[in-house]
């Protein structure tokens, strides 16, 4: 099966984003494909490279990055939601700084919609 994950849960402050990560791992272990992971609303905070949890806490940003790199997954971020919440890359930044974590890319709802049309399942967290 081909899955799309839509994540609107923040990186911390709830269990939604971590649950999405855990389910993504299990979906892949079961031999299914994840075509796209799309972060929107408060979920865009999962892509903030300045997230710095305590040493005894899970760094979910790093977990998403590792999963994307090791499984060659696309981590898409809603550009509108990201800009509203201060998540920017070099191109959208008003100065020379950016806080978009590696492996995440800014994209629009059109990319998400096209991916959904080709998937068997859409999971929202």
Swiss-Prot record:
Belongs to the DsrE/TusD family. Gene3D superfamilies: DsrEFH-like. Coiled coil: none annotated. Disulfide bonds: none annotated. Its EC number is 2.8.1.-. Keywords: Cytoplasm, Transferase. Could be part of a sulfur-relay system. SUPFAM superfamilies: DsrEFH-like. It is found in: Cytoplasm. GO terms for cellular component: sulfurtransferase complex. One of its GO terms (biological process) is tRNA wobble position uridine thiolation. PANTHER family: PROTEIN YCHN, SULFURTRANSFERASE TUSD. The keyword Cytoplasm applies. Its main location: cytoplasm. GO terms for molecular function: sulfur carrier activity; sulfurtransferase activity. It holds the Pfam family DsrE. This is Sulfurtransferase TusD homolog. The active site is at residue 78. It comes from Haemophilus ducreyi (strain 35000HP / ATCC 700724). The keyword Membrane does not apply.
């Amino acid at each position: 099966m081909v899955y799309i994950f839509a994540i609107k849960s923040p990186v911390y402050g709830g269990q939604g984003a971590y649950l999405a990560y855990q389910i993504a791992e299990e979906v892949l272990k079961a031999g299914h494909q994840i075509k796209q992971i799309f972060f929107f609303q408060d979920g865009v905070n999962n892509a903030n490279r300045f997230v710095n949890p305590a040493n005894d806490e899970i760094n979910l940003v790093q977990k998403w990055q590792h999963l994307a790199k090791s499984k060659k997954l696309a981590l898409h971020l809603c550009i509108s939601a990201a800009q509203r919440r201060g998540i920017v890359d070099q191109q959208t930044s008003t100065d020379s700084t950016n806080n978009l974590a590696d492996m995440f890319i800014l994209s629009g709802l059109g990319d998400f919609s096209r991916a959904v049309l080709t998937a068997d399942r859409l999971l929202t967290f």
